[in-house]
């Protein structure tokens, strides 16, 4: 406190707001890091593929006219017709690229310098003119970089496909963190989970496809926006039931982890990528361990193998005493999926550095609270699934009958999975009552019901995992229909800004009403 007559001492400035969230939503929320140098967006996109990965990666936005049977010619060049939606999207995308932003910044700087030069004479004018010439050289370099990025749209048939644009829209909306996901047991076959042959390593087909799709997106997006613009959370799900696992012990665990990491790096970085200009392997952002049965096998050997791969291996020169990296780390961080509190504590006590834990935790399901308490104690981030109950906590389903599992519903993660979740929280009538409360709170604050459910997770200290919708439905998971059209959205993200503010819009009355909706308080499942 300052003495009388003294100038008041200014309070120390807090962390600066995240520039993207501030620009899009007027948010003062500071940027958050998953790990040092690895951002974590407020909402994490959980990606289930809408189609086979091979088919998605074979798509092309480039129109190909019918072939003339009388002539043999190579593929026609892309035609950027001004009326084509792809052309409009290309222009918008190009304007957001790092090279274009740099060119724009330098152009403004050059104009300012030209004005300053006009008012100077002698040595001052010469110095300022030299500065201007240097900026002009940088502008020429930036123009070349812009031209290269523009050409890359023509060279990359995936660059303007619907699925690529959907992921781009989400990242442009400030949600730059993506997680591999998909329907698990019992909604997929055991063969899909564990492959044809008993093996300790997970089959290439389970998360392999979504890894390749997200890896392709990451490489494309970072070509436009710069390195580190997208973060990927991967999953390792070993087959703990196989004979190879039970008899192999720790060596089998190490071999399985190493094989998985190498395959995942190829999926994410491409066959020729994943190496820095200095020749150092680029590490994966995060690997989350999925453990099917804690009674069948102990996850600790796998966690220790992951820990080793998340640590630079060092060597000391006997003569000079200098320390150098003999084996760079292959992953940056380790996460856990659905580990109960006792297993999480065992991993922590074993010295495994856990970055984050993924659980189901929502306004209706609070069974993971012991895990949240432990994470708060040790500074571990929590990723929360189930915020919108697979998409059911939406105005669309208020007063509606249950969805038909035969007909399906594109606005839900999985109709069978959602119906099972409804049964777990007390049935359709119980869901309708809860949805009416949530809708009332949403109307009170001028937001979508999905926003209320997700904000509750954020206020609980979690980072919500929201399942991605695709193409024209890209913003449907946040309650916005038809928002992929620029004419409808005006280029604004289809998500309510109050989700990203520091202060919650939920008041005391809202919190009390939502507290009464909890339907599941049982202990977390081990698996």
Curated annotation (Swiss-Prot):
- What Enzyme Commission number(s) does the record list for this chain? 1.-.-.-
One Pfam family name is Aldo_ket_red
Enzyme class label: oxidoreductase
Superkingdom to which the source organism belongs: Eukaryota
Could you tell me where this protein is found in the cell? Answer: Cytoplasm, Cytoskeleton, Flagellum axoneme
Q: How is it modified after translation?
A: Asymmetrically dimethylated at Arg-191 and Arg-366 during flagellum resorption. Probably methylated by PRMT1.
The record's region (Disordered) falls at 1-22
Q: Pull one GO CC term from this UniProt entry.
A: motile cilium
Keywords from UniProt, A to Z, are: Cell projection, Cilium, Coiled coil, Cytoplasm, Cytoskeleton, Flagellum, Methylation, Oxidoreductase
Tell me one GO molecular function of this protein.
oxidoreductase activity
Locate the Asymmetric dimethylarginine modifications and list their residues: 191, 366
Q: Which residues form a coiled coil?
A: 101-153
Outline what the protein does: Flagellar radial spokes contribute to the regulation of dynein arm activity and thus the pattern of flagellar bending. They consist of a thin stalk, which is attached to the a subfiber of the outer doublet microtubule, and a bulbous head, which is attached to the stalk and appears to interact with the projections from the central pair of microtubules.
Q: Which PANTHER family match?
A: NAD(P)-LINKED OXIDOREDUCTASE SUPERFAMILY PROTEIN, NADH-SPECIFIC METHYLGLYOXAL REDUCTASE-RELATED
Query: Per the similarity annotation, which family is this?
Result: Belongs to the aldo/keto reductase family.
Quote the protein name from its UniProt record. Flagellar radial spoke protein 5
What is the organism lineage in this UniProt record? Eukaryota, Viridiplantae, Chlorophyta, core chlorophytes, Chlorophyceae
């Amino acid at each position: 406190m300052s003495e009388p007559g003294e100038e008041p001492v200014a309070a120390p400035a807090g962390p600066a707001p995240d520039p993207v969230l501030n620009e899009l939503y007027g948010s003062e929320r500071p940027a958050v890091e998953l790990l040092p140098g690895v951002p974590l967006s407020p909402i994490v996109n959980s990606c289930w593929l809408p189609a086979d990965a091979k088919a998605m990666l074979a798509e092309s936005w480039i129109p190909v006219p019918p072939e003339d049977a009388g002539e043999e010619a190579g593929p026609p060049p892309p035609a950027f017709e001004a009326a084509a939606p792809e052309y409009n999207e290309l222009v918008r995308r190009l304007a957001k690229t790092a090279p274009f932003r740099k060119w724009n910044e330098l152009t403004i700087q050059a104009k300012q310098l030209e004005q300053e030069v006009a008012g100077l004479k002698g040595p001052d004018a010469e110095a300022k003119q030299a500065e201007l010439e240097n900026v002009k050289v940088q502008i020429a370099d930036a123009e070349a970089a812009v031209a290269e990025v523009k050409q890359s749209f023509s060279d990359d048939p995936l660059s303007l496909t619907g699925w690529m644009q959907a992921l781009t829209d989400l990242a442009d909306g400030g949600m730059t963190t993506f997680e591999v996901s998909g329907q698990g047991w019992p909604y997929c076959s055991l063969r899909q989970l564990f492959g044809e042959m008993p093996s300790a390593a997970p089959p290439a087909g389970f998360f392999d496809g979504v890894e390749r799709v997200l890896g392709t997106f990451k490489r494309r997006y970072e070509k436009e926006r710069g390195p580190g613009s997208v973060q990927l959370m991967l999953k390792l799900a070993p087959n703990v039931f196989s004979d190879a696992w039970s008899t192999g012990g720790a060596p089998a665990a190490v071999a399985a982890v190493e094989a998985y990491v190498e395959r995942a790096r190829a999926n994410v970085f491409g066959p020729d990528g994943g190496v820095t200009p200095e020749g150092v392997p680029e590490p994966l952002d995060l690997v989350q361990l999925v453990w099917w049965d804690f009674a069948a096998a102990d996850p600790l050997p796998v966690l220790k193998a992951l820990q080793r791969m998340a640590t630079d291996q060092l060597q000391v020169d006997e003569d000079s005493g200098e320390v150098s990296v003999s084996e760079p780390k292959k992953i940056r961080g380790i996460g856990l999926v659905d580990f109960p509190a006792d297993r999480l504590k065992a991993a922590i006590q074993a010295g495994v550095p856990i970055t984050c834990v993924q659980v189901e935790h929502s306004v209706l399901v609070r069974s993971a609270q012991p895990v949240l308490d432990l994470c708060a104690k040790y500074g571990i981030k929590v990723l929360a699934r189930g915020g919108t109950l697979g998409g059911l906590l939406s105005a669309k389903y208020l007063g509606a009958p249950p969805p038909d599992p035969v007909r399906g519903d594109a606005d839900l993660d999985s109709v069978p999975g959602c119906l099972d979740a409804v049964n777990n929280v007390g049935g359709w009538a119980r869901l309708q009552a809860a949805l009416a409360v949530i809708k009332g709170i949403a109307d009170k604050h001028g937001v979508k019901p999905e926003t209320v459910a997700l904000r509750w997770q954020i206020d609980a200290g979690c980072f919500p995992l929201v399942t991605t919708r695709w193409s024209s439905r890209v913003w449907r998971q946040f309650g916005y229909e038809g928002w992929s059209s620029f004419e409808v959205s005006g280029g604004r993200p289809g998500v309510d800004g109050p989700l990203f503010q520091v202060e919650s819009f939920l008041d005391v009355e809202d919190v009390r009403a939502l507290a009464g909706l909890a339907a599941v308080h049982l202990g977390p499942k081990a698996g």
